[in-house]
Amino acid sequence: KRQVLLKDFDKNGFVFYTNLKSDKSKAIKNSSKISMCFHWKSLQRQIRVIGIASKVSKKEADEYYKSRAYGSRIGAWASQQSSILKKRDDLYKSIKEFKKKFPDQKKVPRPEYWSGWRIKPKEIEFWLDGQNRIHERLKYIKKTKSWKKVLLSP
């Protein structure tokens, strides 16, 4: 299970970006069938998406990367996501080194190991909290050209 920041969605799916050497990317490479969940405790609602993940195009990754703040682009170079740090100062030193390497804020290239994943949904389930645990659950299942709607028992 991994937490990600949803950055885009359209008719082709849901998109998030990450380090391709991260644990989540390794898990996706091992099995492209994945799920994601949006939970709104205060609204008593949840949406679960099950689908197939594929990498976004280099062009799409480049476009999004260029839209990020300078510090975030430097961070993509400086941080080896999920690796063990001996001390936090090592990370700050790496950030400083990459700021020297890429002083022009408009010319920070996207690292090859940084890209995005698109989740093409096959199923989407909507859960609405109900009194006495009699929840409402609606599931949409992707067919060739349409979605089939089914009502699930709580």
What are these model-predicted stretches?
Residues 1-154:
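Binding-site signature for planar aromatic cofactors or substrates
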